[in-house]
Regions:
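Nucleotide-activated chemistry modules centered on ATP-dependent adenylation/adenylyltransferase
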Residues: 2-221
Length: 221
């Protein structure tokens, strides 16, 4: 008799329906109870990146390790957010491209223009490959992401729980609005990274850079 994977056992439609009426902490607890040590967090070091680790620690009494992909192009504000998380005792696992920034810029000049023929190629090199490598090395079964549906058009169609490439993504604060996220930041005295800039998201910072296809984000099932 074949062994069933967790993915085969989960009724995603029912889980997502039930999550509509659950608190964010309950969603996090469900994720840990389901995936145990296979659960990780991800962070971009972005504007509200202090929220999910804090909420997770408050929900579970601890936080699973946090995966950060260093694109090689982040500013000091984003690196300071990572330092803050490290100073707060979070276990940060950093992954980066195996190709140096210098090599990339020599081989793919002006790649950061979204209209460049090189744009998607370099995004894959500096973001998708390191993240997938991290997932494989750490044996990630599921990961918590801190995205919210109001942030981009594509995120409006995301589910609380979804699968891609045998990895489950759980978005516990998907339904938070501006007021709720700001209230949480203030009540918990958390830092805000107003100057975060992700070069892979383009000048308007709205691109999802196909990461849902490559690393399991925002794929509806």
């Amino acid at each position: 008799m074949p062994i069933m994977n967790i993915e085969d056992k989960l009724d995603l439609e029912e889980i997502n329906k039930s999550f509509v009426n659950k608190e964010s902490k309950e969603r996090i607890i469900w994720a840990y109870e389901t995936f145990k040590e296979g659960l990780f967090l991800t962070t971009s070091g972005g504007k509200t990146s202090a929220v999910l680790p804090n909420l997770t620690r408050d929900s579970l009494g601890f936080s699973p390790p946090i995966i950060f992909v260093d694109l090689g192009y982040f500013n000091d504000c984003t690196h300071n957010m990572l330092k803050y998380l490290e100073n707060e005792g979070y276990d940060i696992r950093i992954y980066k491209s195996l190709i140096s920034k210098k090599e990339i810029e020599e081989k793919y000049p002006n790649w950061s223009d979204p209209d460049s023929d090189y744009f998607n190629k370099v995004v894959s090199i500096i973001k998708h490959e390191p993240l997938n490598r991290g997932f494989k090395e750490l044996k990630v079964k599921a990961w918590l992401g801190g995205v919210m549906s109001h942030e981009t058009e594509e995120r409006k169609t995301a589910n609380f729980v979804q699968y891609n490439k045998s990895i489950c993504q759980v978005l516990p604060i998907l339904d938070w609005d501006h007021c709720k996220i700001n209230e949480y930041l203030i009540l918990n005295k958390l830092p805000l990274n107003q100057n975060h800039f992700d070069i892979t998201k383009g000048p308007d910072q709205k691109r999802e850079c196909n990461i849902w296809k490559e690393c399991g984000i925002f794929r509806n099932t």
